């Protein structure tokens, strides 16, 4: 049986993304985990979604193409080199496409030491609004904070020369 709480959690990313996507868009659920519910939500709404997860769907060849959207929910905090990985994924995003991220953001340096999110030993990379603004600038992306932990990066609609 599906966890309704998890469905609501992922809908905070899926619902606004679905409003942005063209019909029958092609996407990648990067780091989808063992039960790719977000991919299923997107597919039920007419989109094609490929899966990649280092442990559960390790077919890395699947992410050697371009996509209209890439989602990474509760993934970037687990990456040892998130800048490298996000840049690589960004190159696979078509012009006008969206990269949708979900991760808890650092509120302030003062609160970091007591933040519950750092207690998970698999969380090794942390982001703040400032970090994401920097990343967006580096990528040439339009940044949108959709919710407290839902971030969209939109690629410009033209290929660079």
Regions found by a protein language model. Name each.
Residues 56, 77, 106:
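Active-site micro-motifs of SAM-dependent methyltransferase domains
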């Amino acid at each position: 049986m599906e966890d309704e709480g998890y469905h609501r959690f992922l809908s905070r990313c899926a619902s606004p993304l679905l409003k942005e996507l063209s019909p029958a868009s092609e996407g990648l659920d990067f780091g989808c985990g063992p039960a790719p519910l977000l991919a299923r939500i997107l597919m039920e709404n007419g989109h094609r979604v490929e899966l990649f997860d280092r442990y559960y769907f390790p077919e890395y060849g699947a992410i050697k193409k371009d996509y209209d959207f890439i989602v990474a929910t509760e993934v970037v905090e687990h990456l040892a080199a998130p800048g490298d990985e996000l840049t690589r994924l960004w190159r696979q995003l078509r012009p006008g496409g969206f990269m949708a991220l979900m991760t808890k953001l650092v509120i302030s340096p003062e609160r970091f030491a007591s933040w519950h999110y750092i207690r998970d030993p698999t969380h090794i990379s942390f982001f703040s609004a400032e970090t994401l603004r920097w990343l967006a600038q580096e990528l040439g992306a339009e940044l949108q904070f959709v919710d407290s932990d839902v971030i969209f990066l939109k690629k410009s609609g033209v290929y660079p020369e």
